Amino acid sequence: MSYAIFKHGGKQYKVVEGDIVLLDKMNKEPKALVELVEVLAVSKEGKLSCGKPFVNGAKIEAEVINEGRSKKVITFKKRRRKDSKTKRGFRRDFTRVRITKIVA
């Protein structure tokens, strides 16, 4: 089974062909094709090739499924005996992609 590790938006993802991954928002239309070129490592047929920092000639092709926002995450801070509190919400914008091909 071949897999790849790539970097996008300051995070690293391990994927195989056919995986569905949530990436940071990319402002792409559904069905658009995306190339991810910051590939850190590729494993094909049990042979691992690591890059310094990226693997030369390696790329990952993906198809955009949709864009959306995650569920709201609430952060709440309360300072005891001070009658002071803070409530803040956060929703992450994401692009859902399907990995179609790993080229190494």
Curated annotation (Swiss-Prot):
Coiled-coil ranges from the UniProt annotation: none
Biological processes annotated in GO: translation
Keyword hit for Ribosomal protein: yes
Domain of life: Bacteria
Record keyword Ribosomal protein present: yes
Keywords of the record: Ribonucleoprotein, Ribosomal protein, RNA-binding, rRNA-binding
GO CC annotations, alphabetized: cytoplasm; ribonucleoprotein complex; ribosome
MF annotations from Gene Ontology: rRNA binding; structural constituent of ribosome
Function (record text): This protein binds to 23S rRNA in the presence of protein L20.
NCBIfam families given in the database record: L21
Protein family according to the UniProt entry: Belongs to the bacterial ribosomal protein bL21 family.
Matching HAMAP family: Ribosomal_bL21 (MF_01363)
Assembly information from the UniProt record: Part of the 50S ribosomal subunit. Contacts protein L20.
Protein name: Large ribosomal subunit protein bL21
UniProt source species: Helicobacter pylori (strain J99 / ATCC 700824) (Campylobacter pylori J99)
Gene for this chain: rplU
